[in-house]
């Protein structure tokens, strides 16, 4: 079967009965275009409570039972990153639309295989880079695009998330190929790419002190060359001892934006109409509507694109490009020299 037929109501399957899986289920249930048709998890003890709570028509422990189900229209993959390639390819070849959680995959080569199958089948593949639907970050992008802070000079974001005790079911996060900069740091990288464009070069440092029993560095900092002579920085730590944050700052020639995905306001510094420098010391606090994980907005955009026959809001190439930057960053921290970033074709 080639392509995805547009319709007004979509039978959805959520693969992965985890905390994030539940967020996606709740997001689907809030959408009038979605029907929670099926759920799947390889662990029966994780599947049963979801089956009892949400009562889907189908509940299975093997995703392959859903691949050729004629009643299924689209799947949301909330599974370990190592499974993204295998599952995405299977569902795309069966003519199902796919919303795959971030990161798209753990290597650029895997991403390119997914892109190739999407193109070959005429399928629909969206990557769940949820920061693009976060109200504060959406507003920051709008303010920057409108020229509110002038021309960008420097951008920075951080992903500080204590992974102590967060090894994942069957330790799926604790594998050598899942570096924290790829698995979690892709959020911050994707945000800066979305706002400042594709960086061309990266240099970075990393250490391994916070989670010594994990197989990869747990703290890293990277500096990027962005288009238009904009510089950027991303800090990632999965071994930190603090509450979660994605604090991000955007510096421009006329002002500065400070925001994150947990605060109830965005902070804006800007020059007033008279050009007064005093305005820099008096920030404007712009109220922000918080949305937990923003999966509701993400799913809404996914289904709207399917219904209207439009391109995916976060395309496979976009998802792969973020992975490309993350992979190059890990390489830079290991080699000790700047790395030129290779993007997907």
Positions of PLM-derived features:
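Contiguous beta-strand/loop segments that form the cofactor/metal-binding neighborhood of enzyme cores
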Residues: 189-265, 296-312, 344-345
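N-terminal Rossmann-like dinucleotide-binding module
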Residues: 2-54
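Predominantly a Rossmann-like dinucleotide-binding segment in NAD(P)-dependent oxidoreductases
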Residues: 124, 131-214, 336
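Beta-strand-loop-alpha-helix segment that lines the small-molecule cofactor/substrate pocket
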Residues: 2-6, 74-132, 147
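C-terminal helix-rich "cap/oligomerization" subdomain common to oxidoreductases
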Residues: 1-9, 14, 34, 74-77, ...
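Short glycine/proline- and charge-enriched loop/turn segments
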Residues: 95, 169-177, 276-285
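Conserved SAM-binding strand-loop segment of SAM-dependent methyltransferases
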Residues: 56-63
